[in-house]
Amino acid sequence: MKFIVGLLLVLLLALQYQLWISKDGLGELRQLSRSIKQQRHENATLIERNQVLKAEVQDLKSGLDALEERARSGLGMIKQGETFFQVVEEP
């Protein structure tokens, strides 16, 4: 009887070791859960960014307004007949 109890105790300790301490135990599970959460957050950010870029591409394909806006803001272009005024604020 003592042998069986001892054997069961050793078996219980071995299973507890695998659960808590081994590389495939709860520590690894927590690390994987953190990694998955971080990856999901990163994926959501990238999906949002892709939607913005897709809308911008669609706007550039379909209309001249976005193209004109980019030319004005990025290249400093003005329309014919317009006068450009630059306001400089004093420090």
From Swiss-Prot:
Disulfide-bond pairs as recorded: none
Alphabetically ordered keywords of this record: Cell cycle, Cell division, Cell inner membrane, Cell membrane, Coiled coil, Membrane, Transmembrane, Transmembrane helix
A Gene Ontology term for the protein's cellular component: cell septum
Annotated transmembrane regions: 4-21
Coiled coil feature spans: 26-74
One of the protein's GO biological processes: FtsZ-dependent cytokinesis
Topological domain spans for side Periplasmic: 22-91
The protein, known as: Cell division protein FtsB
Organism: Nitrosococcus oceani (strain ATCC 19707 / BCRC 17464 / JCM 30415 / NCIMB 11848 / C-107)
